[in-house]
A protein has these predicted regions:
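Amphipathic alpha-helical packing elements
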Residues: 57-99
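Polar/charged low-complexity regulatory segments
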Residues: 21-58, 118-166
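N-terminal amphipathic/basic-hydrophobic helices that include classical n-h-c signal peptides
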Residues: 1-19
């Protein structure tokens, strides 16, 4: 018989572990928002930005930006709760297990797939943001007619920001 209180999902670790797992986003971009973890888009990029933010190596990348908000609204998690769990030093798989266990909005695999597919096609939906998007495409390469959505822009901007040619 085990009368001890349940252990926390992840024991606290030295913050140097978080720094060791963090990407330096001043030297390379986070993962594409298209990369999936447990079916979720955005999550791997979000974890990269969270780890880099904690390590002070996030550069121009902002944790909990509007794109990240799609993930938080879909799962019901708060940015603060996820960031607190990232501090544990957990890797991607353990973070996914934590998300699935602690997300207030429990989603089926089909719901996650449909949401992820939607995020890959979502575009800027108000006039001001569409104008901003158009200006950004002009800045990156006005000849690019293949750029339609948020993920297209983020992928290209990441590429160009680190020396690529659009």
């Amino acid at each position: 018989r085990n009368d001890e209180a349940a252990l926390p999902a992840f024991a606290p670790v030295d913050e140097s572990l978080v720094a060791m797992n963090a990407l330096n986003l001043t030297q390379r971009p986070p993962r594409s928002p298209r990369v999936r973890l447990g079916g979720y888009t955005i999550l791997p990029r979000l974890l990269d930005k969270a780890r880099a933010t904690l390590a002070g190596t996030n550069g121009d990348y902002i944790y909990n930006n509007p794109n990240d908000g799609h993930f938080f609204r879909f799962t019901g998690l708060t940015p603060e709760a996820l960031l607190e769990q990232v501090k544990s030093g957990a890797g991607d798989w353990d973070m996914l297990l934590w998300v699935n266990e602690h997300a207030p909005l429990k989603r089926t695999a089909l719901e996650i797939q449909q949401w992820a597919d939607w995020t890959e096609s979502v575009s800027f939906n108000d006039v001001e943001m569409r104008e901003w998007f158009t200006d950004q495409i002009k800045r990156l390469n006005p000849a690019r007619e293949d750029l339609r959505g948020t993920f297209d822009y983020l992928d290209l901007d990441d590429f160009v920001s680190f020396g690529g040619v659009a």
